[in-house]
Structures are given as C-alpha cells and as structure tokens.
Amino acid sequence: MRKPEGCRVWETQGEFIMKESELQNHVRQSLALLGYTIIEIGKTRAKVRCNKCGSYSHATGWQGNTVGAPDIYIHAPWWASCAVGIELKTTKGAVRKQQQNLADQGMTSICRSVTEVLTIVALFEDNLNHNVQAEKVRKFLEVNKHVCF
C-alpha cells in the first residue's frame, strides 16, 4: 500500500494512519486557507516533570482545561459570537467518556479527518444561511479530495 501524497503517517497492518498532531495541523491549515480562526485547546506541547514521582507527562490540569474539552474551537468573523468545538481523533483513537458526553449534548463534534471537520463547518454555515461560504468549503473539499483528508 502506498502512503498518501503529502502526508506524514505511520503504518499499522497495511493501513496508513495519520498522527493526531498531523491531523490537527492539516485541519488548522485548511481552515486558515478558508478564512477561519482556530483556537487550540489542550495540553502543552512540552512534557513537564511531576514534583511527587519524577515522571514526565503532558501537563493539562494547571491550565484549567475542563476534562473532555475539545481540541479546537473554530470561529469566523462573520459568525458573530458563535464557535464550533471539534474533538480530533485518529481513525483508531479512543474517545473518552467525558468527550463523548459533550458530543452527545451537541456541544462538540468528534472528527477523524479533515473532511469530517470541513463537512461540520459547511453544515454550520448552512444553518446560519451562509450558503456562499458553505459552498466555498464544499468546493475546497472537492478540489482537495486527492489529498490526505
């Protein structure tokens, strides 16, 4: 099996799977090209040492993040005070109970690809009657369908 063009991925059992950090980068870049603002939430990129046991891990609690909070919020200047919360997962990534609870309440969407994220954004644009912008997002998806989405 060939690696998809333009993607840094790892292979497992003959299937290529993008790392979550790569997925987030692709999502951020795609949305930025379409004029959206992306607010990233979550753990720091650096690991910190635990004062009690000495082990290293990604720090989250001290940042004040709610457990289960989405990875990103998407906003657009033409949305007034609205935003879309997206929890990104790899194709094999497990969803935590808190993440699923927020998704079940309609507060976030769990997405496993750029295509899923952009589809959510297009539907949100439709709900706001921003049909021209929704079509712009769909055309972007169509033009880039050969890319690792």
Q: How does the language model describe each region?
A:
Residues M1-F149:
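Catalytic phosphate/metal-binding cores of nucleic-acid and nucleotide-processing enzymes, i.e., regions
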